[in-house]
Each structure stands twice: as C-alpha cells, then as structure tokens.
C-alpha cells in the first residue's frame, strides 16, 4: 500500500515521514487556542476541517463523508479520555468515550503492561507505526469488529498517557493519526453501517438509549 503523510513541525530537526494511506493528508503542528466551538467540521462543499488542539486534520472530502466523521468522533472520544474532559462531546463520541473508560477499568493491568513495554522507543513515527502493528495483529485475531476496535482505542489512549501525559500536542497527533487510520482501514464497514453513530446504536442499543436519555435530560 502506498503511504504518505507530511509533517510541518515547529520543532527543529523533526523530519517528514510516511505513515498514512493516500490521498495526501497534511498535518500541521502549530500552537492554537482551545475554544470548543472550533472543534467541528467546517461547512465547506469540498473539504472537511476537523480542528483539534493542534489544528490537525484537513481531508479533501465532503462534509458528510463517513470516513471523516468516524475519524472525528473516534479522536474526540479518545482525547476526552486522555484529558478526562467530556465537556461538549457529540453524543456518539460521548458513548464511545464511556465505552473506552469502561474497558480500561476492566482490563487496566493488561493495557498498562502493553504501554510500559513500548515506552521510550523513539519519535512519533515509531510510536504510530508500533500502534498500527498492534492494530494489524488484533485484526488478524478472531474478534468481532467492536472488540478489535475497543482494544486498539484503549491501547492508544493508554499509550498516549504513558508517553505524552505532559505533551498534549504530541498526544493529539498520535490519537488523531490512529483515529484517521482506523476510519480509513474500516471505511467500508463504517459506510455499510451508516457511519459511527448508527453502528454504535446497533452494537450498543442499551448504552445508546441511556446516553440519549441522559443527554435529553441535561438539555431540559
């Protein structure tokens, strides 16, 4: 598979490298403010801008693109777990965030051991490549789709906490890269289920109903 990504970093000596599938995605690590209202897809007919604390993802696709939507929701959920801040999460991201937290509580020791084994191994490119290798190994095992996805999301969050607890820009880079990779890797599956929100409703109907009720009550 032809892989490409460009890194425009303010840190001297940090070279460009290749990790993500084409079409070309440009990631710019520039310091920005953190107003919640900027973290939403742009209303553009030819591109989707999903803003993160590092001014991250720019993809040449329409606003209703399921890959971009899935990438956005997975990033928001993982970053909320990382920062312990669920404020203003879209409902699908909130449900996924709660599921990640529940899985982390259940298998805390397993994920912690995995993250500790891979600490201090190199730069961001090495970290992302390692997580992708874990993702491929999990997908080769005999799990259902959501079990695989849950393992990778949980491992990525723990990995970010272990290596980037005091560096939110780097953490957002890793979380966002994996979210984008997951969305692209499973794009046909997400599209068949109608995107992340519908797939969450199908896989976790009780959880979704409770989250919807909670969200409704908070809005009263």
Curated annotation (Swiss-Prot):
Keyword list, A-Z: Apoptosis, Early protein, Host cytoplasm, Host-virus interaction, Modulation of host cell apoptosis by virus, Oncogene
InterPro entries with a match to the protein in the record: HHV-4_BALF1
Presence of keyword rRNA-binding: no
Pfam families, sorted: BALF1
One of the GO BP terms on file: symbiont-mediated suppression of host apoptosis
Protein localization: Host cytoplasm
GO CC annotation terms, alphabetical: host cell cytoplasm
Keyword Cell inner membrane attributed: no
Main subcellular location of this protein, as a coarse class: host cell
Family note: Belongs to the Epstein-Barr virus BALF1 family.
Quaternary structure, from the entry: Interacts with BHRF1; this interaction modulates BHRF1 activity. Interacts with host BAX and BAK1.
Role noted for this protein: Modulates the antiapoptotic activity of the viral protein BHRF1. May also play an active part in oncogenesis in Burkitt's lymphomy and nasopharyngeal carcinoma.
Protein name (Swiss-Prot/TrEMBL): Apoptosis regulator BALF1
Species per Swiss-Prot/TrEMBL record: Epstein-Barr virus (strain B95-8)
